[in-house]
Regions:
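Contiguous, well-folded functional domains in the mature portion of proteins
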Residues: 1-159
Length: 159
């Protein structure tokens, strides 16, 4: 039985899909966590919820995030974008910074990334789910940043 549901919002305007569709086996196989993918159609990446930026990769392609509700997240922009060494990304936050839902985290150069990365498909993951927490996708297709993307249902633990 579900005792709590945590809603996670979209950090990106774009096309949302099930994580299994990610063109990378580690993400598609949920080896790094569970969530969804969004292929950006707009350049701004925002905080999905109130929380704290835990880390920004030196290459600016990924941000570790802890929501105020306790979810550890990874916002990974594009596939193999680590190889671009930060080109195509402008970062507006730093490690340890507190942010509110909708605050700008990154800006991306969609044209540059499209030309230089294998895919813009961006995994949005919960990286440290408990056994009693399950992700449920809430939206597929065209989505707008700030609207619900997926839910994390917290189930009552069996005695």
């Amino acid at each position: 039985m579900v005792k709590e549901t945590i809603i996670v919002s979209r950090p990106i305007t774009g096309i949302a899909a099930d994580l299994a569709t990610a063109p990378d086996d580690a993400f598609a196989g949920r080896m790094m966590g569970d969530g969804a993918v969004v292929t950006p159609t707009a350049a701004t990446i925002v905080a999905p919820e109130d929380g704290q930026v835990i880390f920004v990769f030196d290459t600016k392609h990924a941000i570790g995030f802890l929501t105020d509700s306790g979810l550890s997240m990874l916002l990974h922009i594009g596939i193999d974008t680590v190889n671009l060494e930060g080109k195509g990304f402008t970062c507006f936050v730093e490690n340890g910074q507190s942010v509110k839902k909708g605050d700008k985290l990154l800006e991306i150069d969609i044209d540059y990334l499209t030309a230089n990365a294998p895919s813009l498909c961006s995994p949005i993951l919960c990286t440290e789910l408990e056994d009693n927490q399950k992700v449920r996708l809430l939206a597929e297709g065209e989505v707008k940043a700030g609207d619900p993307l997926f839910a994390v249902d917290v189930y009552e633990e069996e005695a």
